[in-house]
């Protein structure tokens, strides 16, 4: 088993041929992928944290050595392998609730239309004829992006609370600025009114005094005319 750890997408490559494993590994690395290679379908299931029940070959159980913390974005497997074929591996992955969303691509050196149709109907994303070319691997990026986007969508968005509370903060700041402006206007208006009130007050007093002087007085009693 070989692992490269610095790539964006993580691909699990399955092939019983050492030459074909090395070939697909190099092509995937040129496509900036992290690659894990295994030589059988059973080892692929073991890496995912699954194993076939000895009592029931059709049933899957959790392996004691679980690798579920390692994110796999795509599985590419040879079709013709001893023991578990690529088609069998495809079915096992699609039967697993935890891993059925992982895209699976089948490779084969034999162009058999019925085999290709069966794999695609079972859920394979692509069926490549060997030798696989670098141009073929460009078709894998959209499939790998699906798993990345799904993982990101499942993450909780902590910033949501900040976004919700932000308008309330701005509204409070706006209200406080209005409150600060209002006293300023009131202060200016009061300063402008004060001399006017003083002037009006003087005029009123002068009018009272002049009125008092014009009224006749009898024994210090003012009579209204």
Curated annotation (Swiss-Prot):
PANTHER family noted in UniProt: TWO-COMPONENT RESPONSE REGULATOR (PTHR43874), TWO-COMPONENT RESPONSE REGULATOR ARR8 (PTHR43874:SF139)
Organism domain of life: Eukaryota
Location of the Response regulatory domain: 10-145
Function: Functions as a response regulator involved in His-to-Asp phosphorelay signal transduction system. Phosphorylation of the Asp residue in the receiver domain activates the ability of the protein to promote the transcription of target genes. Type-A response regulators seem to act as negative regulators of the cytokinin signaling.
Tissue specificity field: Predominantly expressed in roots.
Protein name: Two-component response regulator ARR8
This protein's encoding gene: ARR8
PTMs per UniProt: Two-component system major event consists of a His-to-Asp phosphorelay between a sensor histidine kinase (HK) and a response regulator (RR). In plants, the His-to-Asp phosphorelay involves an additional intermediate named Histidine-containing phosphotransfer protein (HPt). This multistep phosphorelay consists of a His-Asp-His-Asp sequential transfer of a phosphate group between first a His and an Asp of the HK protein, followed by the transfer to a conserved His of the HPt protein and finally the transfer to an Asp in the receiver domain of the RR protein.
UniProt-listed InterPro entries: ARR-like, CheY-like_superfamily, Sig_transdc_resp-reg_receiver
GO molecular function, one term: phosphorelay response regulator activity
GO biological process: circadian rhythm; cytokinin-activated signaling pathway; phosphorelay signal transduction system; regulation of DNA-templated transcription
GO cellular component terms given for this protein: nucleus
Compartment(s) where it occurs, according to its Swiss-Prot or TrEMBL record: Nucleus
4-aspartylphosphate: residues bearing it: 78
Taxonomic lineage: Eukaryota, Viridiplantae, Streptophyta, Embryophyta, Tracheophyta
Location (main, coarse): nucleus
Family: Belongs to the ARR family. Type-A subfamily.
Keywords, ordered alphabetically: Cytokinin signaling pathway, Nucleus, Phosphoprotein, Transcription, Transcription regulation, Two-component regulatory system
């Amino acid at each position: 088993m070989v692992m490269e750890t610095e790539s964006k997408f993580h691909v699990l490559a399955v092939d019983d041929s050492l030459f074909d494993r090395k070939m697909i590994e190099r092509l995937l690395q040129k496509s900036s992928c992290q690659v894990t290679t295994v030589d059988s379908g059973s080892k692929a299931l073991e890496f995912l944290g699954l194993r076939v029940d000895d009592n029931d070959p059709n049933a899957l159980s959790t392996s004691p050595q679980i690798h579920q913390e390692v994110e796999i974005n795509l599985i590419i497997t040879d079709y013709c392998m001893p023991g578990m074929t690529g088609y069998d591996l495809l079915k096992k992955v699609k039967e697993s609730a935890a891993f059925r969303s992982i895209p699976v691509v089948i490779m084969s050196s034999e162009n058999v239309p019925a085999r290709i149709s069966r794999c695609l109907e079972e859920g394979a994303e692509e069926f490549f004829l060997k030798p696989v070319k670098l141009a073929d691997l460009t078709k894998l990026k959209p499939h790998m992006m699906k798993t990345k986007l799904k993982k990101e969508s499942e993450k909780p968005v902590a910033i949501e609370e900040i976004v919700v509370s932000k308008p309330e903060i701005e509204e409070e700041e706006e209200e406080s600025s209005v409150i600060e402006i209002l006293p300023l206007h009131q202060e200016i208006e009061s300063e402008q009114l004060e001399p006017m009130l003083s002037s009006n007050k003087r005029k009123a007093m002068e009018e009272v005094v002049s009125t008092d002087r014009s009224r006749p007085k009898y024994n210090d009693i003012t009579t209204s005319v």
